[in-house]
Regions:
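Non-catalytic, solvent-exposed segments at the cell envelope interface
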Residues: 1-277
Length: 277
């Protein structure tokens, strides 16, 4: 794998594990969708995690648990000793601080990470020849050049631009706010992962990584990715998608945060822990 893609964490394994997860063990991977593209990079803009999706993959149970973490979740930022929005961790300290802060919030080990920016999402979807999705809501959204209309329950074959517009929408009428966006992010990630991991050709898989290499970072080696491909193949048909219930409210610093309901967060933590047994 290209060195520009592989970016190991500063630790050998999670402090919440005595030993690293072995081949065939249940494991966790967090996917960060970064609010950056080529234009923002040229402007040296700060990179924050626009979407955070934590996946627990259990090849023995043949099951995947997928949890969306709202980006505005009020959380402790490990290494900064502050409490603020969880997506700030990536901006402050990249994947290392982001992973440690997520572990602090969810109380489960995070074994690996993958971060991809918005150009990368478009590139991967296009390299796959598009993805087929059924819209979870009816709404209209625009970017600088195009207008996209989606109807709830209708199936669409989307290219990279369309998939990105679909998964980023939240404020548009009918889009369902943060909860609707989280569901769409999970949809796109699930389909992209399933399509990518079903590729049997190493050459084609390498081609996808090469095309997305400037927009993709992961601590996974190519050997580990092949292992993940094998494990996920056993668990991809049984995916439990979860969202954290809570409320958006004004904090003491006059910023709006997402405050998870204690019982909802507790239940999801337990489901993740159970899935790793």
């Amino acid at each position: 794998m290209n060195d520009s893609v592989n970016s190991p964490l500063e630790r050998s394994h999670s402090e919440l594990r005595k030993n690293p997860a072995k081949e065939g063990d249940p494991m966790t991977v967090v996917l960060y969708g970064i609010d950056s593209d080529s234009q923002r990079q040229q402007e040296n803009s700060v990179q924050r995690s626009d979407s955070i999706v934590l996946m627990s993959i259990n090849p023995e149970d043949k099951k995947t648990v997928m949890v969306s973490i709202p980006r505005d979740t009020r959380a402790k930022i490990v290494g900064k000793n502050t409490t603020e929005k969880i997506n700030h961790a990536y901006a402050y300290g990249g994947p290392d601080m982001a992973v440690k802060s997520l572990e602090k919030l969810m109380d489960v080990p995070v074994d690996h990470y993958v971060s991809i920016n918005m150009d990368g999402v478009k590139t991967v979807v296009d390299e796959l020849g598009g993805v087929t999705l059924t819209s979870n809501a009816s709404f209209t959204t625009k970017d600088t050049e195009n207008t996209y209309q989606f109807k709830k329950g209708k199936e669409y074959k989307m290219n990279g631009e369309q998939a990105l517009a679909y998964m980023r929408s939240r404020k548009e009428e009918g889009a369902g706010g943060d909860e609707g966006r989280q569901q769409r992010q999970q949809q796109v990630i699930t389909v992209v992962a399933k399509e990518a991991l079903s590729i049997n050709s190493v050459t084609k898989l390498n081609g996808i990584f090469k095309a997305a290499q400037n927009n993709l970072k992961t601590d996974l080696s190519f050997v580990q990715l092949n292992r993940l491909k094998s494990d996920y193949d056993k668990a991809q048909d049984n995916v439990e998608r979860l969202t954290i219930d809570g409320q958006n409210a004004l904090g003491n610093d006059n910023l709006y945060y997402f405050y998870p309901y204690e019982n909802s967060l507790k239940d999801i933590k337990q489901k993740l822990k159970d899935s790793l047994k």
